A protein has these predicted regions:
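Catalytic nucleophile-loop/oxyanion-hole region of alpha/beta-hydrolase
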Residues: 77-89, 141-144
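Conserved HGGG/HGGXW glycine-rich cap/lid loop of the alpha/beta-hydrolase fold
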Residues: 18-76, 96
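Conserved hydrolase catalytic core segment
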Residues: 102-141
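Short, flexible loop segments at the rims of nucleotide/cofactor-binding pockets, characterized by
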Residues: 15, 41-43, 81-85
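Conserved acidic catalytic loop of the alpha/beta-hydrolase fold
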Residues: 86-104
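Short, glycine/acidic-rich beta->alpha junctions
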Residues: 8, 87, 110-111
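N-terminal cap/lid segment of alpha/beta-hydrolase-fold proteins
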Residues: 2-28
């Protein structure tokens, strides 16, 4: 059985503006000099939770959580305007650039696994590795 790491607090919280009117909530915890790992939550419409930080060893990883457009602490909440898959992939890349990360590990669950795979297809040179759980590929047979 998987044992999660102890609860930790973020050392950084911020909002970054993407396509208007959207602003993404981003937090970082763990080791600022560690291996960067981006946690992509499920949904659409979900959000991150404090327990999402506990998947990673905080001594080894720079843990990055964000709330997707319209989700969690990102604003505006539940807004569908300019909230589509292509924009979400662009948002992930904007986060990487904003945080000045050369390459990172992508961790996605459910809808987050779909976004992680799509991001890795578009930017394979920027991805050190993929960790996927509860994989959802958004195919007809997955939906029906």
């Amino acid at each position: 059985m998987f044992k999660q790491f102890p609860a930790i607090r973020p050392y950084s919280k911020q909002f970054i503006a993407v396509t208007a009117p959207h602003k993404l909530y981003i937090e970082e915890s763990g080791n600022p000099d560690g291996i960067p790992v981006l946690f992509i939550h499920g949904g659409p419409g979900g959000g991150t939770a404090t327990s999402d930080r506990c998947f990673f060893d905080p001594e080894k990883y720079r843990i990055i959580l964000f709330d997707q457009r319209g989700s969690g602490l990102s604003t505006p909440h539940a807004r569908l305007e300019d909230n589509n898959t292509a924009a979400l992939i662009d948002d992930i890349e904007t986060i990487r650039q904003t945080l000045d990360i050369e390459r990172w590990v992508i961790f996605g669950g459910s809808w987050g696994s779909t976004l992680g795979l799509l991001y890795a297809q578009r930017y394979p040179e920027l991805v050190m590795g993929l960790i996927l759980r509860g994989i959802f590929l958004c195919r007809d047979e997955d939906i029906n």
